[in-house]
């Protein structure tokens, strides 16, 4: 009997302990699943925010008379171009939505002044008012991104996790180097819509990334998400049309006030790609019209002025096209060229976003002695017609490859792969280990401007960069035939070409003597590990933080507040008839700055510079030139080169830049 009582007691204790525990785990599991499902269903995926309670705002409009509040400095129209019009509107418009009352507007002049100077930034503030807008803080915790992990491909999750230690180190570094750039930044609402993933069923790009497919886009999106999270902005991420619709509806249903209780109500920036832009245009036209200036388009190869509007391209498509295509499927968006954010800093008209070079796990102490090369080409088609250069390479070094679609048991395998150690598809960690033991990273001429050469350089390998006998462009190369740019590729990677020795040797790989000499030279160089600052976590954090804070494309900005600062502008005229503004600026060790074009597009300036008695106007990517000013803001162009027969001299605005950080001028900090 006692034994039975003991058993019952033990059973009771056991159940009393286990049942709540089981219920706890069941609840957590379900809550986690419910959060994930509701997050996707109702909001899209957002960063997990640790928000503080709203600040209690105390305002006293009796400190100033109504006449004092309506009195503005004499230079108000210069320093605050929209202030007086906004004051005129709000006197009648403040009753149109309750959010104005929530921001302490009561119909008095002082409440109008308070709102337009402290809540918004349209007017000069009254002296006693303190700033109250939410600020972004460096947040190097991966926890903020965990809800977003539900929606992104495996490769992106793996990369963000793998590099998170580097992101934290980068955050510390940038705060040490550039503290003034990283504090007092507005906390922005940022929508990230990865358009090509919304078309994943057709493209299978995420699926292919795990089996040797192209990684450039996924890599850049991964680094952008990490950057935006670390620099402290609020993210809304969508990878499909359903979550995009819910996010759009949420913001469209909010009132007109930018802030309520110190919390930002409106979207500030929308990152997407060309496929995503087309989805917005097709399904959310009104939203796009309202937020067009907030779009930032990830555009790897960049876009030139000739392709940004459909009208100009159609009128000139014969001269802008080669034998392969006369179409412009990736252009015609009508955006400011600075809204196109690129993979490399190759186009002064566009904005450089970039990516981060993976240096996780690099063995800097590894002094490998046996000369070896890894061929840059992870699919068989990239090796086509490369037998001669590969044979030269085999004669001198051990050759490795990572061709994912190569079956060594196939009886029809090309002879080019004989005596090549193929490792097949490797993940990031395995690639890193292989690069630690490689002397030469050997380019075959394609892919153009991928991330791999920078990673090889980070491991201390010399990149042999394939030089082209004739520069490649949309006019003569099928791969580029529909890209919205007239850029000319002189080699596989022009950015690496500029870096040069000891890290890069650019050579015609089909010239046997020159190639053999280059290979032997590469073996002897033994360069140190090197990553340009703009491709480090600290460099990307610094660049993106400044661009989001300073690059203004929506509102009228006073000259004194423009960025880059106007006092950094240097004006030159082109020397040769076919020079672009990039050509003349680069020859002075400067960059062409597109934001300065409206300033120099002035009849008095042209008359003074070119000794003109009068000026005309023209919608041309070469204007302003000679005695002609630019008629279309869409056609201002740093990159456009006029035909020699035009016999014109362009007027060009240039600026300096921080070494290894092209996007930022020396006084832009």
Swiss-Prot record:
Keywords from the named record: Glycoprotein, Glycosyltransferase, Golgi apparatus, Membrane, Metal-binding, Signal-anchor, Transferase, Transmembrane, Transmembrane helix
Entry-listed glycosylation sites: 30, 412, 437, 626
Compartmental location: Golgi apparatus membrane
Listed EC numbers: 2.4.1.155
GO cellular component terms attached to this protein's record: Golgi apparatus; Golgi membrane; Golgi stack; nucleus
Family statement: Belongs to the glycosyltransferase 18 family.
Protein name: Alpha-1,6-mannosylglycoprotein 6-beta-N-acetylglucosaminyltransferase
Gene assigned in the entry: gly-2
């Amino acid at each position: 009997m006692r034994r039975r009582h003991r058993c019952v007691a033990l059973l009771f204790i056991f159940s009393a302990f286990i049942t709540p525990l089981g219920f706890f785990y069941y609840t957590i599991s379900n809550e986690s699943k419910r959060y994930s499902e509701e997050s996707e269903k109702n909001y899209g995926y957002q960063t997990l925010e640790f928000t503080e309670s709203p600040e209690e705002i105390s305002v006293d409009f009796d400190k100033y008379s109504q006449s004092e509040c309506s009195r503005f400095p004499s230079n108000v129209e210069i320093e605050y171009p929209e202030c007086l019009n906004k004051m005129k509107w709000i006197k009648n418009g403040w009753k149109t939505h309750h959010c104005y009352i929530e921001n302490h507007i009561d119909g008095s002049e002082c409440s109008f002044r308070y709102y337009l100077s402290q809540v918004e930034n349209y007017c000069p503030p009254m002296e006693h008012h303190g700033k109250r807008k939410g600020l972004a803080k460096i947040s190097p915790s991966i926890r903020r991104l965990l809800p977003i992990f539900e929606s992104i491909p495996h490769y992106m999750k793996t990369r963000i996790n793998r590099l998170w230690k580097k992101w934290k180190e980068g955050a510390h570094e940038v705060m040490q180097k550039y503290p003034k750039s990283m504090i007092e930044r507005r906390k922005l609402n940022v929508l990230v819509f990865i358009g090509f993933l919304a078309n994943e069923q057709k493209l299978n790009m995420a699926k292919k990334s795990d089996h040797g497919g192209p990684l450039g886009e996924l890599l850049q999106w991964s680094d952008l998400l990490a950057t935006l999270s670390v620099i402290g902005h609020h993210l809304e991420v969508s990878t499909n049309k359903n979550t995009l619709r819910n996010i759009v509806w949420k913001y469209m249903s909010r009132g007109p006030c930018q802030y309520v209780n110190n919390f930002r109500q409106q979207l500030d920036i929308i990152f997407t790609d060309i496929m995503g832009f087309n989805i917005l245009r097709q399904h959310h036209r009104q939203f796009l019209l309202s937020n067009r200036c907030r779009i930032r388009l990830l555009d790897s190869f960049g876009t030139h002025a000739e392709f940004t509007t459909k009208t100009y391209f159609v009128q000139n498509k014969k001269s802008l096209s080669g034998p392969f295509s006369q179409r412009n499927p990736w252009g015609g968006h009508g955006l400011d060229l600075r809204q196109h954010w690129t993979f490399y800093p190759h186009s002064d008209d566009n904005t450089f976003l970039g990516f981060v070079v993976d240096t996780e796990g690099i063995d800097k102490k590894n002094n490998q002695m046996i000369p070896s090369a890894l061929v840059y080409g992870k699919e068989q088609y990239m090796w086509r017609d490369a037998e001669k250069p590969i044979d030269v390479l085999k004669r001198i070094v051990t050759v490795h490859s990572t061709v994912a679609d190569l079956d060594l048991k196939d009886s029809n395998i090309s002879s080019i792969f004989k005596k090549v150690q193929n490792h097949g598809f490797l993940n990031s960690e395995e690639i890193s280990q292989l690069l630690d033991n490689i002397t030469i990273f050997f380019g075959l001429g394609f892919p153009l401007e991928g991330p791999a050469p920078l990673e090889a350089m980070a491991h201390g390998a010399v990149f042999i960069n394939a030089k082209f006998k004739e520069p490649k462009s949309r006019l003569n190369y099928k791969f580029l035939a529909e890209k919205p740019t007239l850029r000319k590729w002189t080699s596989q990677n022009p950015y690496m070409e500029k870096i040069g020795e000891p890290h890069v040797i650019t050579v015609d790989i089909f010239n046997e003597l020159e190639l053999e000499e280059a290979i032997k030279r590469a073996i002897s160089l033994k360069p140190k590990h090197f990553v340009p600052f703009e491709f480090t976590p600290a460099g990307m954090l610094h660049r993106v933080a400044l661009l989001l804070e300073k690059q203004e494309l929506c509102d009228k900005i006073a000259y004194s507040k423009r960025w880059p600062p106007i006092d950094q502008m240097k004006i030159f005229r082109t020397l040769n008839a076919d020079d672009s503004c990039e050509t003349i600026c680069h020859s002075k060790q400067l960059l062409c700055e597109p934001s300065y074009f409206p300033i120099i597009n002035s009849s008095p300036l042209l008359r003074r510079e070119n000794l003109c008695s009068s000026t005309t106007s023209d919608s041309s990517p070469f204007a302003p030139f000679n005695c002609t000013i630019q008629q279309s803001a869409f056609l201002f162009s740093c990159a456009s080169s006029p035909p020699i027969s035009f016999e014109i001299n362009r007027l060009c605005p240039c600026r300096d830049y921080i070494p290894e950080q092209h996007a930022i001028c020396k006084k832009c900090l």
